[in-house]
Amino acid sequence: MKRIFFMAIAVLALAACSNNTDEVLKEKVESYAVVEVKSPLYDALSENDKKIVSLFRQAGEIMDGLFWKQTFGDKAEMEALTNEYEKAYAMINYGPWDHLDNNAPFVEGYGEKPLGCQYYPQDMTMEEWNAFEDPNKLSLYTVVRRDENGALKTVWYREEYKEELEKVCALLEESASLTENEGMRTYLTERVKAFRTDDYLASDLAWMDMKDCNMDLVIGPIENYDDHLFEAKAAYECFILLKDEKRSANLAKYVGLLPTLQTMLPCAPEYKTFVPGTSSDLNVYDAIFYAGDCNGGSKTIAINLPNDERVHAAKGTRRLQLYNSMMAKFDKIMAPIGEVLVTPEQQKYLTADAFFWNVTFHEVAHGLGVKQTVNGKGTVDEAMGSEKTTWEEAKADILGLFMVSSLIDMGEITDITKEESIATFIAGIVRSVRFGFASSHGKANMMCYNYMEKNGAFSRNEEGKWVIDFEKAAECINSWANLIIETQATGNVEFAKAYSAENASIGEALAADIEKINGAGIPRDIVFDFAW
């Protein structure tokens, strides 16, 4: 985004509203705290590395345009809006639908957001889909279109977005020619091949082999959260990251503990036979650029990739903790929420360090657990269908907290207490719930909140403040984790659907809490001004 956009937001914040609609939109725009993105790690780069990062940014801006096409269509429609608040909020949301309000439309003339965005024909019926026998129709890297006779057909991303992808390939090829890091050069070369073939395995493996580079580039069609119809299509995005060598070194020892942590999971032995790869990375970065899917609505503060289970088995995963983004969210959102909700006596347990550890092991938890069902239903993802991402996020939430608590008991994490980890986690649930239920993350957090409340992990005192029962919270961690893993291991999608339908909702007490938070003017999320 251009800096002028953020200047416009500042002007809008001071402008008088002409009507109630403008007032509501003004509040929506201001619900995102503007964060200037910069890093001392960027200042320390060589001139050659700065050239490479500039090329990465150009490639990322193309990813941004491609995501607009995927999630909405023609960005020019939103750029042409005459209401400045509508336009500003549309730029944040990549369209006229509010990410933090279950994708409710906020621009007149637009109805509900299509579940399949632009990945499928808007007029496609389920009867057509079920009769459509193309083996590639559920590929991450195809769109579904109509042929000249009106019949459904698949089109590979490399064909649908060929013009833009060739520009990206040229930029990555130039970057590869400039880098002095062999691992980065190999990764970029393989990523170019991936964009041209829609086969990302080799580039994902090369990315995992890239261990000693001071920067990282996450680019391509990656997550499938944007496809609410089948969760089958990958959305384009880009992160440009600079490695924090000191903080990363402090995390290195935990990679070797992953197999041990897997055996410690609070579930039946037959559900934890998967052995995670030990080539996994666990590193800390400053994020200096977001584009596309990751930049829409609520912002990612940690990454766990690749998603390909073949890579998990062979190489593990890379967990990237985005420290500057994480601290921005803690300072502007988490800490103020804790002051509003948690009893004063327990506010001392809300710490930035605990937030860091909880988020870090949320990402680690994605790589653990069960990958194949135990009853012949195939992979967990296949068996869980439309529930897969909600339950995967729920698993990562609670297993992350389980692992932090376990590592504290083992003496491996020494700078926080279990009380800090648990209290910060519980307050953090509300931060995430405010993302709305348009996201799998929001649904997962709501299920966790309701489970912990019903089982006594916390209650409200006479003043309406939260009082955490740390003993009961510890019991909830184990029992909730066990329920999730068992559901995934057995591929019990019918139970998963029924459970999420009943429990991914906001009750009266939490609704009142959220009103308190909103009344205090606490931002719901952040929006970036890339100041470099």
Regions found by a protein language model. Name each.
Residues 46, 357-371, 396, 401:
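Active-site recognition of the HExxH zinc-binding catalytic motif
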